[in-house]
Amino acid sequence: MTDPRILSLQQAVPALRLKTEPADLEHYGRDWTRRWTPNPLAIALPGSVEEVQAVVRWANAQAVAVVPSGGRTGLSGGAVAANGELVLSLERLNKPLDFNAVDRTLTVQAGMPLEAVHNAAREQGLVYPVDFAARGSCSIGGNIATNAGGIRVIRYGNTREWVAGLKVVTGSGELLELNNALVKNSSGYDFRHLMIGSEGTLGIVVEATLRLTDPPPPSNVMLLALPSFDVLMQVFAAFRAQLRLEAFEFFTDRALEHVLAHGAQAPFAEIHPYYVVTEFAAGDEAQEAAAMAAFETCMEQGWVSDGVISQSDAQAAQLWRLREGITEALARYTPYKNDVSVRISAMPAFLAETQALLHDAYPDFDVVWFGHIGDGNLHINVLKPDATSQADFVAACDQVTKLLAQALQRFDGSISAEHGIGLVKKSYLWSTRSAEEIALMRGIKHVLDPHLLLNPGKLFETHDAPTNIPAG
């Protein structure tokens, strides 16, 4: 029997596409965490901004919670619909809308995949420089909702730096046009930046105007083998002093083992405990000489044990696969993921402390580390032992996150660097944000989403949001 609320929605928005088949509910109701059982009311697939507004207004009238949905590649449970929410998928809003050659901006719908954004920019002789391994699956709206970073933050920064303007539907169904792609705008609060990183709890991004830039010069990729993590910052400093770095990524021997088992080619005859893949501007003899000088300095100091530099685009892709292939290689284990950040200078001490802490507390766990050294972001993947039940594993991993949160508080770090808080990390927001900050977040949500219907339960609990803040 069809739920009467679905019939009501069909009557309110007659042209709206709806999906209610069990397979669709499961597909659209979860993200890559695979931790919660999906249980959405239905899947709404609007074909216009006006339909998004109409759905949100209907949700307010019917008191139905709404979960905005993009590519659902998130790793924090931010797109999970497990409590009868209406999933509002933006996948049909997936087209480029406008290119402005003078402003060098590209306006796109929020459901457009990141890879399609890259292609659209490339067609104009420019680039949108934010990039990560899930580029073919993730949507630009989801990137904005989490202020995603990726592999080239060291050169280009996070998503936030490249958003010139937004169109956002608020929790009451109003449409906000934020900043209008202005370069300078000193006219009060910039609500664009409030929406970026808000995880769909304040509004639904429906369109984005993105800044584009010139294509980078030709680059080389170098893979370095390190004898210990303690020397990593010396290697980073040596290369940063000589070269314009595009990326500087690290991973462990355990990460490499999983990627090699997944079909990648071994880069060296011997296994080393730590690796760095770095990309830097090249194209002339001076840059190549600088790269070799940095490498030789590191070898002489004993900071690097071995290295290889790409001689072709194909070899560069092979070297990058060793880093970008980690997530795919680990996927079959359904790892418990943590995505944390500390100041770059604090990374060696933080990693040493947390490695020892996790080894002592959970010696049977296989912990795989990799991350973005250039911006202080570490990814910690815990793999379930075969002899451990899923329930016991999740319970133990919750304790892992608690230990990490306590360590991050000591190091003034963040429990989420780029994946967002979602459901996974909301119990540990205290390690990153003060009680006063969290109270202000709740107050802001109440103003923009007065019935607390947008992505409820994500980022923080909303049942106790204040009710005495004026909406006007």
Swiss-Prot record:
It is an enzyme of class 1 (oxidoreductase). Activated by Zn(2+) ions. InterPro entries: FAD-bd_oxidored_4_C (IPR004113), FAD-bd_PCMH (IPR016166), FAD-bd_PCMH-like_sf (IPR036318), FAD-bd_PCMH_sub1 (IPR016167), FAD-bd_PCMH_sub2 (IPR016169), FAD-linked_Oxase-like_C (IPR016164), FAD-oxidored/transferase_4 (IPR051264), Oxid_FAD_bind_N (IPR006094). GO terms for biological process: respiratory electron transport chain. The lineage of its organism: Bacteria, Pseudomonadati, Pseudomonadota, Gammaproteobacteria, Lysobacterales. Keywords: FAD, Flavoprotein, Metal-binding, Oxidoreductase, Zinc. Zn(2+) binds at residues 372, 379, 418. PANTHER family: D-2-HYDROXYGLUTARATE DEHYDROGENASE, MITOCHONDRIAL. One of its GO terms (molecular function) is oxidoreductase activity. This is D-2-hydroxyglutarate dehydrogenase. The keyword Lipid biosynthesis does not apply. (R)-2-hydroxyglutarate binds at residues 323, 327, 337, 381, 419. It comes from the Bacteria. Its EC number is 1.1.99.39. Residues 36-215 form the FAD-binding PCMH-type domain. Binds 1 FAD per subunit. Homodimer. Its cofactor is FAD.
